[in-house]
Amino acid sequence: EKTFLGHTGDLNGDDIIDIIAKEPATARFICRHLYNFFVADEVQVPAWTIQDARDEDALEMMINAFEESGYEIKAVLRTMFNSDFFKNARYSKIKSPAEVVASTLKMVGSYQTPEPTIPDIGPESTYMGQSLLDPPSVEGWYTGQEWINSGSLLARINFVADRVANTSLPGISAIIGHIKSDGVNSPEELVEASLEHMGFLEVGDETMSQLLDHAKAEGNMNWNDEAAAGTRVGEMLALVGATTEYQFG
């Protein structure tokens, strides 16, 4: 016979898990982790005991689903994925270095089949602060804004900019083709199209002004010179990739 968290009896491993699952702190801990992973960046885990959740109402909804379902994770996920707070959470998570690398390569169409140079990509996330399969501790990596510092930000910007400006890559070539076929001509249209193709990005007034100033310096698009027009599109995509809104959302 043993006592665990106030429960005494002939307890086995399953009993211990059941007792832990029914603790109020368990529901909050699990649901806050799920919110942090799928919805929006939270403060780091060590601060959870002293700082409220980013969205207490959302967290309470998830906790209720967990408890009312008999402690089923799938009920929490169903509630979360069908919720308005999940559907409305855009640009609420900072990409990890692995996500920056993978999403960029997917967008530009690199490495669609196995290639000898694939191992060369591995260190890129390390330069941004995430050595794959080698977390700093059993706790894993601190996420959210912890991914960003002066060194990692430069590495992130350079990785994205170098690739989206490469008009020979199939994904970028396709973007240029779409922009051309859509009849994009004015600097304003070029900026809007570039933001759309980089993820329907919403930027602030200051960022928009800077992008427009750059686009207006070269006037309207000249699609008669396809190489120059493509280069111009690539440059604009690279500028978008360097914005605060892209890197922090």
Regions found by a protein language model. Give the residues of each.
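A Trp-anchored, charged/polar loop motif used as the substrate-binding/catalytic surface
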Residues: 12-19, 23
